[in-house]
């Protein structure tokens, strides 16, 4: 349980809504240290429970020994860590962010899998990320992020790779976001744009920046 409490603690300050539910279980060589919120809305809570079950089932499938491995008595001791952040952007708009990390044979994976889900509290229903995006959403996010990461410490000295391609509007990195009181929060995976020492990188873009109209570059008239 100490491991679970330590893992969950890093997300506590970003839990704006929901009562944390802790699951600490062990089955044979697999352990589960899970935390998720109870919101108090029947259908949303049922969906959250379903998401946690899906994550758990995928973990089980990955680490359950095959028949061959069972014969050879090979198995991997594994722990599933699950933590969350929850953001209330407006009165009824909830963004729920799950963080999933695996530990195998005592080694903590350097990768954290991040999933974001959106809910309308008034309608007690899940909503799609697409329904929350304006036409210029990805373009504005791309322009702001590229400028921010290439001009701001400590990011400008760490960004690597072909970041213009990686941060292009259609590259998929702006499909995963949370809506907060301050703006749109994007998560960039460890090792994606920066060295591993940066960890998971978060960037909140103010709503005013996300709503700007982007002018198309003017075509220059060739000189005769």
Regions found by a protein language model. Name each.
Residues 1-224:
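Compositionally biased intrinsically disordered regions enriched in Thr/Gly
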